[in-house]
Regions:
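N-terminal, active-site-proximal structural segment of metallo-dependent hydrolase catalytic domains
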Residues: 1-68
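A short C-terminal boundary segment appended to hydrolase-like catalytic domains
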Residues: 265-313
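Structural motif
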Residues: 68-69, 157-159, 182-183
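Active-site-proximal beta-strand/loop segments in catalytic clefts of secreted hydrolases
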Residues: 27-30, 74-75, 99-102, 127, ...
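Cys-nucleophile CN-hydrolase/nitrilase-fold catalytic domain and related Cys-dependent amidase chemistry
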Residues: 41-125, 190-193, 197-202, 207-208
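Active-site catalytic loop in hydrolytic enzyme cores
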Residues: 2-17, 105-179, 197-201, 260-270, ...
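CN hydrolase (nitrilase-like) catalytic-core segments centered on the catalytic cysteine
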Residues: 85-97, 168-286
């Protein structure tokens, strides 16, 4: 049953002028490389050296490549690491969608997504409960959130976050006003990516002024299928170049890039003023999505990255 008892806040992040172009980094974790525990019928990540090494590796790559915003998958960032990420964001003028963590709230738990800006940390709540988070006991499991937000006047534009199953709630997305959003972030831990892709394609097509959707999903065997991705519209000839290199198979059409199973991240730039390319092109109509850095096997970045986080020798 969908949760209908929630509010949508308007958060004015700053008075900064929006950047015409931003660099984004999607991070993808592999569950088996990290340590987990079950607490009150909820799967929670443990704050260990393995996780710390991965976070440091990601943030080092982000810093060295001038990233403006990072997104991590659902359940990947424990509350104990949020303060460290905020210090990093403040020092590097960066935005971080810091996955989610569970917080005890009354008899049960709330799922919190920290939206970290250079100025402060905002909290939004996951609104709807997935089948894996429910429990027959009143003091266990996740019982649904009460508050989410639209973020305005930020350097990366107007944006919102829908955590995993919340993205499938059309009523919630209607209250977030998709036509006013420039970016939608979807941190996730799910094994039905095809269903998410279908909805993302529709939402990008239906956006009047154009919108990019950034999807960061956990890779966890049968529980979560990875396939983190970026959705947006492009001129056909530009998108064809991505098809040739295997960045996308256009299934569906507005899928611009899908991370492979052995990828941990991708960095790309987005033209925030050309979110919906028109058919009427001119000499200034370029490419609104550009790949900056991939950890692809061809240049051994996967090996170097895994070595850095001590997953391999």
């Amino acid at each position: 049953m969908l949760n209908t008892h929630y509010t949508v806040r308007n958060e004015i992040v700053s008075t900064d002028q929006a950047s015409p172009e931003i660099r984004c980094m999607i991070c993808q974790f592999v569950k088996d490389e990290l340590d987990w525990e079950e607490v009150d019928d909820l799967l929670m990540i443990r704050n260990t050296s393995k996780l710390h090494n991965q976070i440091v590796a990601f943030t080092d790559v982000a810093k060295s490549n001038g990233v403006d915003v990072m997104i991590f998958p659902e359940c990947s960032i424990p509350e104990s690491l949020v303060e460290d990420l905020y210090k990093f964001a403040a020092a590097n003028d960066m935005y971080i969608i810091a996955g989610t963590h569970y917080k005890k709230s009354g008899p049960a738990y709330t799922s919190i997504c920290p939206v970290i800006t250079p100025q402060k940390v905002y909290e939004i709540e996951k609104i709807n409960v997935s089948p894996f988070e429910d429990s027959p006991y009143p003091n266990k499991g996740f019982k649904g959130g009460r508050s989410t937000a639209i973020f305005r006047n930020s350097r990366i534009g107007t944006f919102a976050v829908t955590v995993c199953i919340d993205f499938m709630n059309d009523e919630l997305k209607g209250k977030l006003g998709l036509n006013d959003l420039q970016l939608l972030f979807v941190p996730s831990f799910n094994n039905t990516t095809d269903n998410f892709y279908e909805r993302m394609d529709i939402n990008v097509n239906d956006s009047r002024m154009g919108m990019y959707i950034l999807y960061a999903n956990m890779k966890a065997g049968n529980s979560a299928d990875g396939c983190s991705a970026i959705f947006g519209q492009m001129y056909t000839d530009m998108r064809n170049k991505l098809v040739k290199t295997g960045a996308t198979d256009e299934r569906p059409q507005n899928l611009l890039y899908r991370l492979k199973d052995d990828q941990r991240y991708v960095i790309f730039s987005l033209d925030m003023q050309m979110r919906k390319p028109t058919r009427a092109r001119n000499i200034y109509s370029g490419c609104n999505f550009k790949i900056v850095k991939e950890d692809i096997a061809e240049d051994q970045e996967v090996y170097k990255f895994l070595k850095c986080i001590k997953v391999t020798d």
